[in-house]
């Protein structure tokens, strides 16, 4: 339920920004942060958090935007690292989940770059590093299956 509420607030903020009502957009975002705090409902790609961060970037509040994007990127990195720590059997049945979280992290980095966030310098190399680890492992597993 709170996932959809955060998403609705992000949509409201984006519409207010399009209408030039930046003060109202900022107030809506701040209200959503107060009423749906991340410690109760963690930021997630699917619950409007990315759109909220992007709205904060558009409003010039890069500190709040970066805080949200960092939490989102850290979550993706944590999942990706966890998948890579699995044994070969579990890893091979989790490749779609890995690919999903990798795509999420990649998209988050693109948003960071779009708004010239210094976070991109931290997470862009992670995207490449994690993908390379995945590709090496996936290739090794494919070779093992052919034998």
What does each model-found stretch correspond to?
Residues 1-147:
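C-terminal luminal/periplasmic domains and tails of membrane-associated envelope-modifying transferases
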């Amino acid at each position: 339920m709170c996932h959809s509420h955060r998403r609705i607030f992000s949509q409201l903020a984006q519409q207010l920004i399009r209408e030039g009502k930046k003060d109202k957009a900022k107030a809506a975002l701040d209200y959503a942060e107060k009423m749906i705090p991340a410690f109760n409902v963690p930021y997630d790609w699917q619950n409007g958090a990315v759109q909220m961060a992007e709205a904060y970037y558009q409003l010039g509040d890069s500190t709040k935007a970066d805080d949200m994007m960092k939490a989102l990127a850290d979550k993706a990195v944590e999942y990706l690292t966890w998948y890579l720590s699995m044994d070969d059997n579990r890893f091979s049945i989790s490749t779609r989940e890995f690919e999903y979280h990798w795509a999420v992290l990649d998209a988050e980095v693109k948003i960071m770059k779009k708004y010239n966030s210094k976070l991109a310098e931290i997470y862009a190399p992670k995207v490449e590093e994690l993908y390379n680890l995945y590709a090496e492992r996936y290739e090794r597993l494919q070779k093992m299956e052919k034998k």
